[in-house]
Amino acid sequence: MAPTVKKRTSQNQGLSPQKSQNSVVVGGIQVLDVRTGPDSITQIEAFLNPRMGKPVDSDFYGFSDNITVSADYTQDMPRIKELPCYSMAKISLPMLNEDMTCDTILMWEAISCKTEVVGVSSLTNCHSAVKRLYDNEGAGFPVQGLNFHFFSVGGEALDLQWLWKNYRCNYPAGVAALQAAPKAAQVLDPKLKAKLTADGKFPIEAWSPDPAKNENTRYFGTYTGGLQTPPVLQITNTTTTILLNENGVGPLCKGDGLYLASADIVGFRTQQNNKMHLRGLPRYFSIHLRKGCANPYPVSSLLNTFSSEMMPLNSWMLQVEEVRIYDGVERLPGDPDMIRYRIIWPGRLLSLIFPAMRHKHLYFFVMQAFIVL
């Protein structure tokens, strides 16, 4: 007997094309296309050494100075050499654009990253002038205690938020710190922000990555507390971190610059005199980038600038830094260069839909439509 043929159900008939979110606003740069070809992909390798406090010419380079503890909240004055700071670097990428007046430009887009803490095996050292388990006997204490691991890859400097345990702490000169911080510094104060623009200047204990910003940066971090916590670190060259967001776009390198940052504290080293200092390790990066065709100055950004100048937000307590707006779902367009502009004006809403602006007179057309409103 011949096998029966299963009939198609109505659920499998006439499948409609998949729909995606209608992206109205997503960052300040509009990606129009991804370039392909033998020279469209490049790889950058770099490493960042830890900035634990001790200078490069010190015998304890890679360590902080001996940790001091204040006896009173109002007398908290850490020394500069006992303050681990973020490591950062700006890597100049090959120049892609000779003419910056075009309506579209090429930009490097970071798509994936391989990174690893280097020197994990050095933590097995238990004999280099450290405190021993028993009096004059036994192995020395290995590096142990709190662990903080962080790295970031971005097309611009990492955005930071100041948040500190003791607002009355007096930081030394030479580090990026507030000398007269308000009480709100012990929680999230939207006014206390900065960008990581200097290597070894931003104390890790006071600055954190800003989750409300960093639209063009990907960051990752873990923390494990304690004084005797054993460090647990993985060694492998097979793990790849994808840097693309939910829209398939990675960090776009503005000005042909790639920004890297890291901080890797693996614990305390306890000396024979019971004094302790922190140990840091370097981090290796391998970044893959591809070329992307982008419009960094779309008309929607210009119109948004005009609107914000006429109707500014006048309250710093509004804890909104960046906004992404989605309006329902739509069919994926056959023309990937189709651009939608939606101009919101008090009491009115105007939608403009036309192909990619390949001629500059279209800028004038949209500006006229805005003026008519």
UniProtKB/Swiss-Prot annotation:
UniProt main location, coarse: virion
Location of this chain's protein in the cell: Virion; Host nucleus
Spans annotated as C-terminal arm: 299-373
Free-text note on domains in this protein's UniProt record: The intrinsically disordered C-terminal arm interacts with neighboring pentamers. The unstructured nature of this region allows to make different interactions depending on the structural context: pentamers present at the 12 icosahedral fivefold axes bind five pentamers, whereas pentamers present at the 60 icosahedral six-fold axes interact with six pentamers.
A Pfam entry, by short name: Polyoma_coat
Organism: Murine polyomavirus (strain Kilham) (MPyV)
Task performed by this protein: Forms an icosahedral capsid with a T=7 symmetry and a 40 nm diameter. The capsid is composed of 72 pentamers linked to each other by disulfide bonds and associated with VP2 or VP3 proteins. Interacts with terminal alpha(2,3)-linked sialic acids on the cell surface to provide virion attachment to target cell. This attachment induces virion internalization predominantly through caveolin-mediated endocytosis. Once attached, the virion is internalized by caveolin-mediated endocytosis and traffics to the endoplasmic reticulum.
Subunit text: Homomultimer; disulfide-linked. The virus capsid is composed of 72 icosahedral units, each one composed of five disulfide-linked copies of VP1. Interacts with minor capsid proteins VP2 and VP3.
Other remarks on this protein: The virus attaches to the surface of cells by recognition of oligosaccharides terminating in alpha(2,3)-linked sialic acid.
Family as reported in the entry's similarity comment: Belongs to the polyomaviruses coat protein VP1 family.
Annotated GO CC locations: host cell nucleus; T=7 icosahedral viral capsid
Keywords: Capsid protein, Caveolin-mediated endocytosis of virus by host, Disulfide bond, Host nucleus, Host-virus interaction, Late protein, Phosphoprotein, T=7 icosahedral capsid protein, Viral attachment to host cell, Viral penetration into host cytoplasm, Virion, Virus endocytosis by host, Virus entry into host cell
Region annotation Disordered: where it falls in the sequence: 1-21
GO biological process: caveolin-mediated endocytosis of virus by host cell; virion attachment to host cell
Chain intervals with Polar residues compositional bias: 10-21
Gene3D superfamilies (alphabetical): Capsid protein VP1,Polyomavirus (2.60.175.10)
A molecular-function term among this protein's GO annotations: structural molecule activity
Record-given protein name: Major capsid protein VP1
